[in-house]
Regions:
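Sec-dependent N-terminal signal peptides
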Residues: 4-14
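N-terminal carbohydrate-binding/catalytic regions of secreted carbohydrate-active enzymes
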Residues: 25-97
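Aromatic- and acid-rich polysaccharide-binding/catalytic face
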Residues: 51, 73, 101, 156-210, ...
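Aromatic-rich peripheral "rim/lid" segments of glycoside hydrolase catalytic domains that contact
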Residues: 68-72, 234-291
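Active-site groove signature of glycoside hydrolases
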Residues: 91-113, 134-145, 170-179, 202, ...
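Active-site clefts of carbohydrate-active enzymes
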Residues: 135-148, 196-224, 243-261
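Extracytoplasmic
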Residues: 280-409, 426
Length: 503
């Protein structure tokens, strides 16, 4: 039940097929003290929550349906089954039931596999009465564990194995897991759970490992970003919920896990949780264009972390030989394209490129002097018009990848200048943004576009610049709501990108 991290550099990608969804069906929160304002704010980005109880917490018990967020009742142990049945009789909007809470822990539900199996038919009867699906007992590795028949159930999968043996005809539609391990350890944990061939709910997770303690909230952010991106994009993960909304100590106290701050407000960690891109399996990157590597279609073995590169949001890393990531692409026309991969690493590596599972070439990656010391690696790629599947396969490990840019060879002659740009004030308080170009020639015609974190354009203005400093009024047409935005300023063969916060 815990994890790890880096510093965040928040520039959001613009690419073909940007996800039109505003919130993930998978994403939820494990928390039992929501206020109306808490739920109103969180409901923009979460689709469900639970509180370890049979019914919603009292402040939102009769109104939560107004927020389009599912409540999922839990039978914490066998005693909780009656309460779940009573609530299911009252609330016709529920879809799922959660089984027992960490029954292999003596300090939690404290039920042996046989005891859990004996109690299960009562929960199953409720599900069948109301046409609901059931999540298995939620398990994890324990310290003080239940024992039965000479077996101490430290291993959660041994517990589930014996539960299923004792309950072989029971209705169990999903596997329930908790996890607090550090780093990318959740990947191997999920891989172990795939053997049951059922969709998975991860109903508690955070980096909270006393053997590998997160030192600060920035490290927790790094863990959250990589883990949520993995869970969001894994097809075997049905739903997940971060632990927890609030703690008594607050976000600046170990283990630094609070999503909520003051009433109705998000912490920085909470905002990051809400902002992780929603997975769209139909998304295609348009070529020519840029592929942000964390937005893969399918992946094996790789893990993401926040990048400190000059642009990008997350990079993929934790590379081992045989790891791979796939991307759906749409190529506008036949041609030989320039390929630029943004690489960082402490050793030389190699990447195989495959198109539609046909090997095309191998790219060698250099030692850049560090995992966040970024450099461009250039090559060429022949592509035909239409839909394709581009696969990156790690031949030799030792590198991170931020993005891959695939551009026309003809356009390479007119190199795009990245303008060194200063934007202030930031945060923006009254809609007025001052832009300063730090370059020899600042004049020309430029198009200013503002995008929200989902890639939706919310502002457009053409400006004729005749000096290094100019102003943009973001509220010129409509008032821009508070939030995080991506400002793009493009001219002939030049561009500038800045992340801004509007208050």
């Amino acid at each position: 039940m815990r994890k790890k991290v880096l510093l965040l550099s928040f520039l959001f990608t613009l690419s073909f097929g940007i996800n039109s969804q505003t919130k993930s069906y998978k994403r939820g929160v494990a928390y039992g003290y929501h206020s109306v304002k808490d739920m109103e704010n969180a409901s923009k980005n979460i689709s469900w929550w639970y509180n370890w109880a049979a019914q919603p917490e009292s402040p939102i018990r009769t109104t939560y349906q107004n927020f389009n967020v599912d409540f999922t009742p839990m039978a914490w142990n066998n005693i909780g089954i009656t309460g779940v049945g009573s609530w299911a009789d009252k609330d016709s909007t529920i879809k799922y039931l959660l089984g027992f809470n960490e029954p292999n822990f003596r300090e939690q539900a404290n039920m042996t596999p046989t005891q859990a199996a004996k109690a299960w038919p009562a929960l199953q009867k409720i599900a069948q009465k109301h046409d609901l699906k059931i999540v298995s007992p939620a398990v994890n590795y324990c310290g003080t564990c239940v024992t039965e028949g000479g077996v101490t159930y430290t291993n959660p999968f041994k517990y589930l194995d014996d539960f299923f043996k004792a309950c072989d005809t029971c209705q169990v539609d999903f596997i329930g897991l908790h996890w607090y391990g550090a780093g990318n350890s959740i990947m191997s944990y999920i891989n172990d759970a795939r053997k049951y061939k059922k969709p998975i709910w991860v109903t508690e997770f955070a980096s909270w490992d006393n053997n590998s303690r997160v030192p600060n909230v920035n490290e927790q952010k790094k863990y959250l970003a990589g883990t949520v991106n993995f869970l969001e994009r894994d097809p075997d993960i049905y739903r997940y919920s971060w632990f927890i909304g609030r703690t008594q100590g607050g976000i600046n106290t170990f283990p630094y896990i609070d999503l909520y701050g003051a009433n109705g407000m998000l912490t920085e960690l909470g905002q990051l949780y809400m902002d992780i891109p929603v997975y769209d399996p139909e998304k295609k990157f348009e070529i020519p264009g840029r592929i942000e590597t964390e937005e893969y279609y399918l992946m094996s073995g790789l893990f993401c972390e926040p990048t400190s590169d000059k642009d990008g949001f997350l990079n993929i890393g934790w590379t081992d030989a045989g790891d791979w990531a796939e991307y759906k692409i749409f190529v506008k026309k036949n041609g030989t394209y320039n390929l630029t991969a943004r690489i960082a690493g402490s050793g030389a590596g190699r990447i195989d490129l495959l198109v539609d599972n046909i090997f095309i070439k191998t790219i060698n990656t250099p030692n850049t002097g560090g995992w966040q010391n970024w450099a461009d690696v250039n090559s060429e790629l022949n592509l035909t018009e239409g839909d394709h599947l581009l696969k990156l396969r790690v031949r030799a490990a030792g590198f991170n990848i931020n993005w891959i840019d695939i551009s026309n060879t003809t356009s390479a002659k007119n190199e795009i200048e990245i303008i060194d740009t200063e934007v202030y004030p930031n945060p923006v308080t009254n809609g007025i943004v001052n832009v300063v170009f730090h370059r020899a020639q600042s004049g020309g015609e430029f198009t200013c576009r503002l995008f929200d974190i989902y890639g939706k354009q919310v502002f457009l203005k053409n400006v004729n610049v005749n000096r290094a400093l100019f102003q943009i009024n973001l509220n010129e047409t409509n008032r821009i709501p508070a939030g995080i935005y991506y400002l793009n300023i493009s001219g002939e063969n030049s561009t500038a990108n800045k992340l801004i916060v509007v208050q």
